[in-house]
Curated annotation (Swiss-Prot):
Record-listed Zn(2+) binding positions: 46, 340, 365, 369
Coiled-coil region list: none
InterPro entries referenced in this protein's UniProt entry, alphabetically: Cys-tRNA-ligase, Cys-tRNA/MSH_ligase, Rossmann-like_a/b/a_fold, tRNA-synt_1_cat_dom, tRNAsynth_Ia_anticodon-bd
GO BP term (any one): cysteinyl-tRNA aminoacylation
Gene source species: Drosophila pseudoobscura pseudoobscura (Fruit fly)
Disulfide bonds: none
Main location: cytoplasm
Name this polypeptide is given: Cysteine--tRNA ligase, cytoplasmic
Subcellular location field: Cytoplasm
HAMAP family referenced in this protein's UniProt entry, alphabetically: Cys_tRNA_synth (MF_00041)
Source taxon at top rank: Eukaryota
'KMSKS' region, short sequence motif: residues: 398-402
GO molecular function, one term: ATP binding
Enzyme class: ligase
Length: 741
């Protein structure tokens, strides 16, 4: 072959790279993720039923969905069309809205009610509530109801006592206290008496509107991306009616007394259909099915309308005191399960890629969604991948709204930042149970601090190189840089493999922790010559990954957490660090010169002022100033609240150290005092006070009989004699010391 012709080229063999696999509840195993339409992903997420404050159970789902969504979009590069619903028509909403309205009216009128009438009402409330307590079989809920009953009774006793004492001011206070303590039982009693009289639709609209706004505010505070499309049930009633009609036309639903029910057994008999795909073991679980029907839809007359106890409502005939919409079957409202089916199908059609929701919704809600949707389209599959987030417990205990054992999102945000909450979720599998506890949050807080210290160090160590000597960022590449680069590359491989494996963020963060630890060792061992470009590459990669995970908001490309300290949208403002740091740096340099001069002159008052600037003034401005050996220093912009917490923790640790020192000092003094007191005891009297052990003594004070009158054994007598002899020696020393004095 002529040398003037190019030689044959050997193509590299492609390496095996992991593919994204997701745990699919429809198969109960991890499956390769293959969208229906190339790189485009259609995704429907179950949204909230808006009748109360959002709590950490909601956060468990929506933060986890947001993490999954961001990673699929920003890491794996899928084009995601994300739809979420708002359930604003529901039995819970109807009942809560009615009860709130009636209670507010009653509370406003109660100030003018004669006391005997108020107390008469109280007796009726008590009887009804006692019936509720008696019917309840859940032990945890029974405890909660009993506590409510006790508080209500205590409030009544306090009110009647104030009346008997003629205390007018006390009566007004105790009356209000009773209303506060007995709010739920009173509202339940009022609903039973007057609920059917409520016919103003505004009552049923204002409650969900208010709580929907609060929900969106909570999601924004948690740095959760808004959906691309938001569907409200109240705006989809015509589409829901049409969807139900399709199921009837396909012979799998039937009307009864102005309601419409899904024919579960008829559906399951069809060859292409399968009821309860997610939880087949639950087929026939009428208790769960009834819970899914709603509080206002399980009366005996409603249940008797069904052909089978397995059937569930697609359309509910509205009774007096319930909102209604027109339909071919009469005035009513949609059933809970049909709402999501109709809305998702209106946006996506007969099939879509991903459906997400909490694990507690698997049966009956999601199984019913699947059944009625497949019945409407006469297809065997409506959703390809069903992803369910795990339960959330509160310090190891089951969280339950009915038990009033829940932490609202706003309450959680008062204790921890949105970043810390998200890190807590990232450090756990999205599909497993997460325990929201002090230990969990401490783990997240420490991880955040660990990363933040690394980011601050990298920025401080490389800042001067970039601004003053940019050539030094390309320092010679030695074995230590090669080793860190190798660790960096292997960590990227580990992170990718973890994210491909069912979006395992916990393992990804473990790999990041190891990479940061290796980088910290590199910094420690190579202070005289650091490759700033390599360090910044590592820090930028980790920061970018945290952006992808939603733990950092704002534009990508920087290093570290935003100076505001949060993951929320406030962090997305201008580059505060670039703007402020030059001024802070100048102040720090001036302080350093003053400090060095003060040391030379032994001007301790000036040194104290320099320390005060470092320890008290700058932290209040979000600036951490660190004095280092050799007259050097480091300036770091940190979230002000974090710095103040650090300072408080440092002061608390110092106070505890001082207290421990004082405790030890007092213990030594007490031991010395006890020893001195022991020396003063006459050996003949040392056992006489131990009457709980002995009942008789000889002329030398030695015990002869135990407390039961039995003679002391010879072996025991010898031990007591030895103790007495030792005391005799101490006593002689004491007497001698007195004579010398």
């Amino acid at each position: 072959m002529s040398k003037r012709v190019q030689p044959a080229w050997q193509a590299p063999k492609p390496a095996e790279r992991p593919k994204l696999r997701l745990y699919n509840s429809l198969t109960r195993q991890k499956e390769d993720f293959v969208p229906l339409d190339g790189n485009n992903v259609t995704w429907y997420s179950c949204g909230p039923t808006v009748y109360d404050a959002s709590h950490m159970g909601h956060a468990r789902s929506y933060i986890s969905f947001d993490i999954l969504r961001r990673i699929l979009a920003d890491y794996f590069g899928y084009n995601i069309h994300y739809v979420m619903n708002i359930t604003d028509i529901d039995d819970k909403i109807i009942k809560r809205a009615r009860q709130n309205h009636l209670f507010e009216e009653y509370a406003g009128e109660s100030a003018n009610l004669p006391l005997d009438q108020l107390l008469g009402h109280q007796k009726e409330v008590l009887v009804r509530f006692q019936e509720t307590c008696a019917k309840n079989t859940d032990p945890d809920k029974k405890v909660m109801l009993d506590k409510t009953l006790q508080r209500m009774n205590d409030a009544v006793v306090a009110l009647t006592t104030a009346v008997s004492q003629g205390d007018e001011k006390g009566i007004a206070e105790k009356r209000q206290h009773y209303l506060n303590e007995a709010k739920d039982p009173i509202a339940e009693w009022l609903d039973g008496k007057k609920g059917a009289e409520i016919n103003d639709n505004a009552v049923f609209e204002s409650l969900p509107r208010f709580w929907e706004d609060q929900f969106h505010n909570d999601m924004k505070s948690l740095n959760i991306l808004p959906p691309d499309v938001l569907t409200r049930v109240s705006e989809y009633v015509p589409q829901i009616v049409a969807f139900i009609q399709k199921i009837i036309d396909n012979g799998l639903a039937y009307a009864a007394n102005n309601s419409v029910y899904f024919d579960v057994n008829g559906f399951d008999r069809k060859e292409k259909h399968h009821y309860a795909k997610l939880v087949p073991e639950a087929y026939g679980d009428t208790k769960s099915l009834q819970e899914g029907e709603g509080d206002l839809s399980v009366a005996e007359d409603r249940l008797s309308e069904k052909r089978s106890a397995n059937d569930f409502a697609l359309w509910k005939a509205s009774k007096a005191g319930e909102p209604w919409w027109d339909s071919p079957w009469g005035r009513g409202r949609p059933g809970w399960h049909i709402e999501c089916s109709a809305m998702a199908s209106d946006i996506f059609g007969s099939t879509f890629d991903i459906h997400t929701g909490g694990v507690d919704l698997k049966f009956p809600h999601h199984d019913n969604e699947l059944a009625q949707s497949e019945a409407a389209f006469n297809e065997s599959e409506w959703v390809k991948y069903f992803l369910h987030t795990g339960h959330l417990t509160i310090a190891g205990c089951k969280m339950s709204k009915s038990l009033k054992n829940f932490v609202t999102i706003q309450e959680a945000l008062k204790k921890h930042s949105a970043t810390q909450l998200r890190l807590a979720f990232l450090l756990h599998s999205w599909k497993d149970t997460l325990d929201y506890s002090e230990n969990t949050m401490e783990m997240a807080t420490q991880y955040e601090k660990f990363l933040n210290e690394f980011f601050l160090n990298v920025k401080d160590l490389t800042r001067h190189v970039l601004s003053e000597e940019p050539r030094r960022q390309f320092d010679a590449w030695t074995d230590v840089e090669a080793a860190l680069q190798k660790k960096f590359s292997s960590s990227q491989v580990q992170v990718h493999a973890a994210l491909c494996d069912n979006v395992d963020t916990r393992s990804a963060l473990d790999a990041i922790r190891e990479l940061v630890s290796a980088s910290n060792v590199y910094i420690r061992d190579n202070k005289s010559r650091l490759n700033s470009l390599l360090l910044r590459n590592v820090a930028t990669y980790i920061t970018d990954l945290l952006h992808v995970f939603g733990a950092i908001a704002g534009p990508r490309g920087g290093i570290g957490f935003p100076v505001s300290g949060g993951a929320g949208p406030q962090a997305a403002g201008g580059d505060l660090e670039t703007t402020v740091l030059p001024y802070v740096q100048t102040l720090a340099e001036f302080r350093n010169l003053v400090r060095e001069q003060a040391k030379a002159l032994k001007a301790f008052d000036i040194l104290k002022l320099c320390d005060d600037l470092r320890d008290n003034i700058l932290p209040n401005l979000g600036v951490r100033l660190e004095d280092k050996d050799g007259g050097k220093f480091a300036v770091k912009l940190v979230d002000r609240d974090s710095l103040l917490r650090e300072r408080e923790a440092k002061l608390a640790a110092e106070a505890e150290k001082a207290a421990e020192k004082e405790r030890k000092k007092q213990a030594v003094a007490a031991a010395a005092a006890a020893k001195d007191a022991q020396r003063r005891v006459n050996p003949k009297q040392m056992f006489l006070g131990e009457t709980e052990k002995y009942s008789a003594f000889d002329e030398n004070g030695l015990p002869t009989l135990d407390k039961e009158g039995k003679e002391i054994s010879k072996g025991q007598v010898k031990k007591l004699q030895k103790l007495q002899q030792q005391q005799e020696q101490r006593y002689k020393e004491y007497l001698a010391s007195i004579k010398e004095a």
